[in-house]
Amino acid sequence: MKLIKLKLASFRNLQNIELAPGKKFNVFYGNNGQGKTNLLESIYLLATMKSFKQARNAELIAFAGEFALVKGTVERDQVRREIAVLIEKQGKKAKVDAKLMTRLDDFFGNLNVVLFTPEEISMVRGGPDLRRRYLDRAVFTCDLGYLTAYHDYAKILKNRNALLKVNETTGIEVWTEQLVQAALLVIERRKAYLDRIGKLLQGFYSEISGNDETVQIEYRLHGVDERLLAEDPAGALNQALRAHAAEERRRGTTAIGPHRDDLYFGLNGRSARQFASQGQQRSFVLALKMAEIEHITRCFEAPPVLLLDDMTSELDRERNRNLMEFLKKREMQVFITTTSLHNVDIDELQDNRTFRIKEGKILD
């Protein structure tokens, strides 16, 4: 899978861009604030219909603009498809080969991407929201039904929270029952993904670290009895919700569910968050992204497009080398941003193209 053409109109500070990326490594360099990350954001949006910065539609449109347009030509197995996303303040519209997509499930999968940002390096030590965001992105790529399950859960959660905010108990049982069923679907899909990448994670971590340290990744439900969950999943969630009922009324929000769950990262049987060194934590996240890439490659029998946002400044020389060696072995397209070409060992990257970005313009 390759992105062979990209066109942007009024997307953030990228006014009129036409780009023909190389099929392997594409390096975009320039000072901060010139548009490098915006370029990666446009590719991510072309694949997922979302901004990885959680930006509103209006923020994606250039100043004084009415709309933004992102178009790309994707090639897979010698078949080309034209993808377009129109961004207006009131919403987005997507087309594939000029056909308007009325179901998002028909749109997704035409371009698969994996994103690696400095934010994710802090995923081990950071808050649970970072880990949930990573997990949702990773699960969704190979499990398109996850998006529907998650959106259903989010709608039910919103309605239940609305009752809690006004301390209205009438009807709360109905929403609680629906919440539990929707939550179980989300949890099931999240856990299934973690089961699939567990062995991959260990293999890549061993390759990076060069030692026999063991790593674990586990799903942790907030406030739920894990032993009861195995026997009676719905009963375990209902019990947890009952136990937190007073807290929910006091706070006016749902205290139990996938929106509060977390991931446990283990190293040699202990919490990586508490006991791993900074180097070990970075190796863990790097192995996690490698496992994600390998998983997607197996799902679609084609590697995803990789977006590396200023990662060369976040990884030390050895981990940079490990990442690049991993990428060189795979027939995948990579987009790299950096403030300086000195941060990227260009000579070691075969089939590379470099682009300078200045004030929203791309200079070859």
UniProtKB/Swiss-Prot annotation:
One of its GO terms (molecular function) is ATP binding. The RecF protein is involved in DNA metabolism; it is required for DNA replication and normal SOS inducibility. RecF binds preferentially to single-stranded, linear DNA. It also seems to bind ATP. This is DNA replication and repair protein RecF. It comes from the Bacteria. Its main location: cytoplasm. PANTHER family: DNA REPLICATION AND REPAIR PROTEIN RECF. One of its GO terms (biological process) is double-strand break repair.
